[in-house]
Amino acid sequence: MKTIISLVGCIEEEVVGNFLKETDDILEEYCEYLDQLEMIKPEFVKPFPRITIEISSAGGDVHYGSAILDRIEEMQMLGIKVDTTARGLCYSMAFIIYLMGEERYAGRWTTFMNHASSSRQVGYLEDIKNNVAFLEMMDDKFDELILEKTKMTRERLNQAKLKCDWIGYEEAIELGIINIFDDMEDNEEDEEMPF
């Protein structure tokens, strides 16, 4: 069974379609796993493998991103452990998806970015007003998720509504965005190398 799912590029229809197909396969495997549990003595039961979502994305569409959030939440509610790893860039909607991981890793060269939703809506005034109300509602939901999963403050989130909030690796650790990391400084020893 595949335990690593890649989210690379713009979060749009094709990327989400692939993600849903891959996670459909995982959900099917999980159902088979649960069926087999009834026939195995508890002491011989192995845990279902953790799933890792590797993200390298500048973000994308709120609607497609929400489909990914829903699927991750569905898997977690069923008892599947879902972790996330960021590689290089994790911006906008990808940042929100990343925060859904129970264990959140990132490479040292990774940067994160949060900002308010944007739109290229054109059309009738009422349609534009409805779109703004929708985006404000989604931003409120995303802000609540960020506040729940990190040490970021509401003040900082409000500032991100005015401009992009760029976050480097070290700051991401301090803010609890990355919650699993190797502290290289603590691992360094003063002993001489044997060669």
Please report, for each region that a protein language model flagged, where it lies by residue.
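Terminal-region recognition feature
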Residues: 1-195
